[in-house]
């Protein structure tokens, strides 16, 4: 049996402000840093260890991983920073307040933009300063692969090559893998692992800073999965994530 641990980054500054974030590189709040440290403590208490870590190229996920590694005394393990694990690109919604956007366009439209499988938000213009074409962290990414907007289907399409070419082979070689990433890149992985339908994925939310443990068979099919931590607090966190895109 193999184990895989997925962790969404701790609360970010724009999570706190209820803004669409996507590829904008915001940092953790103090609460987010504490969530990440607690995740590391829970993993250590559960007797888990890791041989390799994957994260995105965005600091909220990177710093979350740092805190987890620090709590587990695993700062020395190899880390792969992969743009394919970035959050879904929210296009022209990046930086907008979710509740204000819902008040303007309606809860239903914002739910579609946030959670539908194949409907992307309005795209950025290529000349928009929020576009990532000139960002040095994407210097080796083909321009046509740098998005101006994404739906979850697009996110799945960029995450899966990394899974197939790197993450899955690492797991099957016996390496213990932890992935610190983002709500939608983790939803993409969970959709694949649990074979969730395009319709049902709309209802899946991922809480901040909470280790999600998968136990996998020899073919990397899930035997079971579970969150580490206080289950009531996790349920409250999931409910809070679900309500972010509603008008107030």
From Swiss-Prot:
Source organism of this protein record: Cupriavidus taiwanensis (strain DSM 17343 / BCRC 17206 / CCUG 44338 / CIP 107171 / LMG 19424 / R1) (Ralstonia taiwanensis (strain LMG 19424))
Protein's name according to its UniProt entry: 2,3-bisphosphoglycerate-dependent phosphoglycerate mutase
Transcription recorded as keyword: no
EC number, UniProt record: 5.4.2.11
GO BP annotations listed: gluconeogenesis; glycolytic process
Region feature Disordered, mapped onto this chain: 117-137
Family as reported in the entry's similarity comment: Belongs to the phosphoglycerate mutase family. BPG-dependent PGAM subfamily.
Enzyme class per UniProt: isomerase
Subunit structure and binding partners: Homodimer.
Described purpose of this protein according to its UniProt entry: Catalyzes the interconversion of 2-phosphoglycerate and 3-phosphoglycerate.
Membrane-spanning intervals of the chain: none
PANTHER family in alphabetical order: PHOSPHOGLYCERATE MUTASE
InterPro entries: His_Pase_superF_clade-1, His_PPase_superfam, PG/BPGM_mutase_AS, Phosphogly_mut1
Reaction catalyzed: (2R)-2-phosphoglycerate = (2R)-3-phosphoglycerate
Record's keyword annotation contains Isomerase: yes
Classification of source organism: Bacteria, Pseudomonadati, Pseudomonadota, Betaproteobacteria, Burkholderiales
Annotated positions for site Transition state stabilizer: 182
Pathway of action: Carbohydrate degradation; glycolysis; pyruvate from D-glyceraldehyde 3-phosphate: step 3/5
């Amino acid at each position: 049996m193999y184990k895989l641990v997925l962790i969404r980054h701790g609360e970010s500054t724009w999570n706190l402000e209820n803004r669409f974030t996507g590829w904008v590189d915001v940092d953790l709040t103090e609460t987010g840093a504490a969530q990440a440290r607690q995740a590391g403590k829970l993993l250590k208490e559960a007797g888990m260890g890791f041989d390799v870590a994957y994260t995105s190229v965005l600091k909220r996920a990177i710093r979350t991983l740092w805190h987890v590694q620090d709590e587990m005394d695993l700062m020395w393990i190899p880390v792969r920073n992969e743009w394919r694990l970035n959050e879904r690109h929210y296009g022209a919604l990046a930086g907008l307040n979710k509740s204000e956007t819902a008040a303007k366009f309606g809860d239903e439209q914002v739910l579609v933009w946030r959670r539908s499988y194949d409907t992307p938000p309005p795209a950025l213009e290529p000349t928009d300063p929020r576009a990532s074409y000139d960002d040095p962290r994407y210097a080796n990414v083909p321009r046509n692969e740098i998005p101006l907007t994404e739906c979850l289907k697009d996110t799945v399409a960029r995450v899966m090559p990394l899974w197939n070419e790197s993450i899955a082979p690492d797991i099957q070689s016996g390496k213990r893998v932890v992935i610190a990433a983002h709500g939608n890149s983790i939803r993409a992985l969970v959709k694949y692992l649990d074979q969730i339908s395009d319709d049902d994925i709309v209802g899946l939310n991922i809480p901040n800073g909470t280790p999600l443990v998968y136990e996998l068979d020899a073919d990397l099919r899930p035997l079971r999965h579970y969150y580490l931590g206080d289950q009531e607090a996790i349920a409250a966190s999931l409910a809070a994530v679900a309500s972010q895109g509603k008008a107030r």
